Amino acid sequence: MATPYVEDESGKYIAATQRPDGTWRKPRKVKDGYTPQEEVPVYENKFVKFFKGKPDLPPGMSPGDEAQARQQQQGIPGIAESETAGLSKTAKRNMKRKEKRKLQGPDSNVEALINAVEMPTSNPAEATNDPSGAAAEKAKKIKNLKKKLRQVEELQQKLDSGEIKQATKEQLDKLGRAKAIQDGLLQLEEDS
């Protein structure tokens, strides 16, 4: 929107205008070389100018050749060109993979999962047949049982000394398992 200038013998003026409420604005003097704010071009740095001036076609290619090249380009089957136009190479590859999965059908993955679930699972220590792994497993169990036995003994001492006046149900259950823990510990120590 260019501002209408009025030229007079004393210089350029922006003419007096009437406001919507009926009052008048004063005419304003405009200096030589003044460019109104709305007419000032937007600043563009060198990078932007370079890419605006850069041709869309590769060097040496005519616009007719470009049309032929676009027609020869193959799109992804089953997907319109407009969908893949702005996608990166990786995104296009992922879309191809999705298409393949759709074509294979959802049942192929389900059958593989069912077969995996139906196979009997075994203890990882037995599957490896690694004596050091089995020994480590036993050592871990022995350590765990010794810790539980130590906790039971500490609880019994606290009850005997009167530190704990009334034992809770969980504490009584723990005391009741003391014999089973000792038997399990003895059995593991005999096996090793």
From Swiss-Prot:
The gene is pym1b. Residues 90-103 have a biased composition (Basic residues). One of its GO terms (cellular component) is exon-exon junction complex. InterPro entries: PYM1, WIBG_mago-bd, WIBG_N_sf. One of its GO terms (molecular function) is ribosome binding. Belongs to the pym family. Residues 51-138 are annotated as: Disordered. This is Partner of Y14 and mago B. It comes from Salmo salar (Atlantic salmon). It is found in: Cytoplasm; Nucleus, Nucleolus; Nucleus, Nucleoplasm. Key regulator of the exon junction complex (EJC), a multiprotein complex that associates immediately upstream of the exon-exon junction on mRNAs and serves as a positional landmark for the intron exon structure of genes and directs post-transcriptional processes in the cytoplasm such as mRNA export, nonsense-mediated mRNA decay (NMD) or translation. Acts as an EJC disassembly factor, allowing translation-dependent EJC removal and recycling by disrupting mature EJC from spliced mRNAs. Residues 120-131 have a biased composition (Polar residues). It comes from the Eukaryota. Interacts (via N-terminus) with magoh and rbm8a; the interaction is direct. Associates (eIF2A-like region) with the 40S ribosomal subunit and the 48S preinitiation complex. Keywords: Coiled coil, Cytoplasm, Nonsense-mediated mRNA decay, Nucleus, Translation regulation. Signal peptide: none annotated. Residues 132-171 form a coiled coil.
